[in-house]
Amino acid sequence: MKKHFTLPRNAILRDGGEPHSPNPSISKSKPPRKLRSAKENAPPLDRNTSTPDHRSMRMKNPLPPRPPPSNPLKRKLSAETATESGFSDSGVKVIVRMKPLNKGEEGDMIVEKMSKDSLTVSGQTFTFDSIANPESTQEQMFQLVGAPLVENCLSGFNSSVFAYGQTGSGKTYTMWGPANGLLEEHLCGDQRGLTPRVFERLFARIKEEQVKHAERQLNYQCRCSLLEIYNEQITDLLDPSQKNLMIREDVKSGVYVENLTEEYVKNLTDVSQLLIKGLGNRRTGATSVNTESSRSHCVFTCVVESRCKNVADGLSSFKTSRINLVDLAGSERQKSTGAAGERLKEAGNINRSLSQLGNLINILAEISQTGKPRHIPYRDSRLTFLLQESLGGNAKLAMVCAVSPSQSCRSETFSTLRFAQRAKAIQNKAVVNEVMQDDVNFLRGVIHQLRDELQRMKNDGNNPTNPNVAYSTAWNARRSLNLLRSFGLGHPRSLPHEDNDGDIEMEIDEAAVERLCVQVGLQSSLASEGINHDMNRVKSIHSSDGQSIEKRLPEDSDVAMEDACCHTENHEPETVDNMRTETETGIRENQIKTHSQTLDHESSFQPLSVKDALCSSLNKSEDVSSCPDLVPQDVTSANVLIADGVDDPEHLVNSASPSLCIDPVGATPVLKSPTLSVSPTIRNSRKSLKTSELSTASQKDSEGENLVTEAADPSPATSKKMNNCSSALSTQKSKVFPVRTERLASSLHKGIKLLESYCQSTAQRRSTYRFSFKAPDSEPSTSISKADAGVQTIPGADAISEENTKEFLCCKCKCREQFDAQQMGDMPNLQLVPVDNSEVAEKSKNQVPKAVEKVLAGSIRREMALEEFCTKQASEITQLNRLVQQYKHERECNAIIGQTREDKIIRLESLMDGVLSKEDFLDEEFASLLHEHKLLKDMYQNHPEVLKTKIELERTQEEVENFKNFYGDMGEREVLLEEIQDLKLQLQCYIDPSLKSALKTCTLLKLSYQAPPVNAIPESQDESLEKTLEQERLCWTEAETKWISLSEELRTELEASKALINKQKHELEIEKRCGEELKEAMQMAMEGHARMLEQYADLEEKHMQLLARHRRIQDGIDDVKKAAARAGVRGAESRFINALAAEISALKVEKEKERQYLRDENKSLQTQLRDTAEAIQAAGELLVRLKEAEEGLTVAQKRAMDAEYEAAEAYRQIDKLKKKHENEINTLNQLVPQSHIHNECSTKCDQAVEPSVNASSEQQWRDEFEPLYKKETEFSNLAEPSWFSGYDRCNI
């Protein structure tokens, strides 16, 4: 989530230096806001009207303060800026959409669409870009507005869509769709708004572009934000807690909303979630016109960034485009909406904001039509201030004006259409926001140019006859270096800063200082004979275009005044913090060889190249005066370029001697083991400031070795000569560079004074720094007090040093050196042992042979370890040679594979040209693939990376085992610790002050193991002891010399092996890089061949189609020609007939193609028709079955109703019969007693006729009850076979 919202401003439209227009009408068109009318076309106020107080205006104005007239943010438009900008004009696209009428408004329509781009309102015609009638769909609106917007966005243009109109006219529906249209189940519906459709198309097009330009590494990134402007206050809809946000404006980034939330989106679902979240927080309210009226302006912004890079030429581009979707609140009248209270306040703010927008559009339209400059009031409202880039700026604007065709909205419709007409007249300046980067090709050109200059410098450096060439070469080098620095390529990486603020005393090796001064004098004498001539020539040398070098000095002064840099033979120059140096050698090679040979004969140092011996060299335009008192006249060398800008002693030391090591020395000596008497060699070291361990104070150089030396202090005469040399240097340098002369001179004098103070202050002759020509990576040694220590040296070293002292130093220094040599001459190489005057002396006598034995044993062990290491290095070299051979084999295989690819291309070309048949092509291709498979198999089996990994693994295992054996099993660590302890005790004896007087008179012990102890030697044999000790001294010296020579040879062989290994590693890296490049080239070639095959297949198919078409055309032409020949047409008419025949044949072919297309269409339509007929038939059958089922259901329902009715009737009859039966039973019950009484009477009276009477009475009763029995029988018969009971059983 990103809290930043940027709207870039078009700098072309800004004109800060242009004054206000003198036209009074223009100045009056912008009165103070407090007296402004709320109407759009309010007349300008009188010029004499008094302006209100600025304080009250500032209190009521919520916007940021206006910039002063001199501020470049003040924007004015004029015809000159429009013509001078050079950008293509793009007008505003206006689309009018008519809202469908409501039920109460039908039949009362005043807006009528005349054509696709015009409409009439009450007889008045308006013309726009497009007209959407009430029947238009959301998809049609998207095709008119959204589709071009997406394409413009992908092309790199800023695009905006405004929805403008009265309240309830359908703006929100057009922009966002219905209220539930953003849910997932409605995302694919027809009612979707413009915004979801735009982003659906945008993400689809992004995927297409990424697939289409996959080789260009095309990547897109989209981020969105949503805000509303409610009552002139900006609220973040994605984070509603952030209210009243401020609009900021910056010259670089343009207009943006501070602290606005931006979220990255990747698909349509993310955008929909943002819209649902944001639009749910938007202010809406109900009015009498619209139940869901938007009460604020809503701005949805999406920034689309694309990056692509062409791998072939290194060209990369960065495009940025912005989509602004603005849903403006609708204008409304209080009379029609009935707004009151808060709604009335909202309506007032909305109308005021829209009025200011209309005023802004009026001014922009007037500027576009008349070309007169006017002030554009972007700051009148938050809306216009935020969207000023879309209005007359760098954007393509489309405005959707929604109108209602009802008679009741006539005035609002006219106002909207007039607003749209004015907006259509605006001309924006839309440009593609793309940044192209072509650094690779440019740098290739720079490299080519620098190579040419380097070649010219090498060629011209060997030409001593033309001295002017060196000057031009130096200036070309400076110009090239300027070019590199302008692109950041000439700035070397600095070493990490070291904290040197500690209280550490540094010891200066003052002999090295003097030798440095001597060498500076030697080298500066090179140009002593031709200094005046060269200084005069600097002023007269002219470049090829006629300009003198003096005139070009100010241009290149920043390069010329760079600090000096020390170059080595095998390494790049390195720089320390705040020290960037450059070196330009203008010395001929024959002179360099002569000077190096001279230095070899006259100094004790190992022969060094000029790059190692000097800090840097002067250009021939920068001459240095020599010190004739210090330097012989027959010695010549290179000029030295003194680094400027050095203000402190440490920098002075660094600039004076780049190859000197600065060794920190502790306040008290640290007792550590001395180094073996092994002579280190000079190595090509980089110029750097390194702190290392202390070196022995009196260690001296020996036979081509470069060790730390220490000599006597320089004399005042020498310091005076150094002062003269530095003053001469600063004086002559000021002639060429007058800018920094004083600073350079002061720094030199300060450094020389500091050296003099160090030389004269301390009694022990120690200084803060030690100067040494020792390589920075050499082994450290222990620092011991010069007056209290004895050091083993090689015979002859004193003589060499003394010779050097006699050759170059002053008289005082020479005497001092001779005295020191005489003091140490009697015992130059042997170890000093105290006499037997104390218990300490006796202890040291007993420990001397044992200590010497341990030292020799340790040195032998180390020599054996060194031999073993050399053997391992030789085996590694052998393995590396094998690895090189495998790399060469791999490169040869790659070359063969490349050749096979070229042969394949030739075969493909032959196949396309028809020279090679398809079968031959397949056979050759198969053979080539078999050969390539074999090569790849060999490469896989003998891959160098596998062997390299095995070699490294074996080497690591051997090293681990050796370290384990050396320090663990052999006990070398304990032995070394014992040697260190013994040597410390021995050294303590020498440092003891009580033994200093005995050191001068003591005799040396015999260092042979067969010699008798010191206590057993009588005093009478002094002469024989001296002879014996002399012999032992000689033997010891020879043995030590052999060990030193052997160690030197081994070290030389080791360094040679290391150099060979480094060289082979470098070659391996080159071979590996070449292999990778060949692999990449092979991959690219294979991809290119695949694309060529695809294109070839497409071309072959098209070729076959064209051949068939050509044959048909040719046949038609032949037919027409035959017909013309049969008709007897000849001459000019035949040519006309031929042309006509060709045209007719082409038309026939086209008609045949169309006929075939129509035939296919007809077949498809017939198929669809048959399917439709079958579907209709099936639907008819289904309908018939449904109708039959419906009729059966109706009959069954009717029968069920009849059965229910009959059952009800039967139940009623049963009830009646039950009642009747009960009545009859009651009647019979009453008749039975009467019958009994009557029977008794009758028995008494008529006993004779009893049987007949009984028979008649029974028959009478039966007759009376017979109808009842019949009815019961009928009822039972009716109930048993009833269909209703069977129907029930069927239903069950």
UniProtKB/Swiss-Prot annotation:
Region ranges (Neck): 424-461
Entry-linked Pfam families: Kinesin
Annotated disulfide bonds: none
Claim: Cytoplasm is one of the keywords in the record: yes
Comp. bias (Pro residues): 62-71
Record has Coiled coil as a keyword: yes
One example GO MF annotation: microtubule binding
SUPFAM superfamilies reported in the protein's UniProt record: P-loop containing nucleoside triphosphate hydrolases
Subunit structure: Homodimer and heterodimer with KIN12B. Interacts with TIO.
Biological role: Plus-end directed kinesin-like motor enzyme that plays a critical role in the organization of phragmoplast microtubules during cytokinesis. Constitutes a signaling module in association with serine/threonine-protein kinase TIO that is required to support phragmoplast expansion and cell-plate growth in plant cells. Binds microtubules in an ATP-sensitive manner.
Protein name in the entry: Kinesin-like protein KIN-12A
Organism field: Arabidopsis thaliana (Mouse-ear cress)
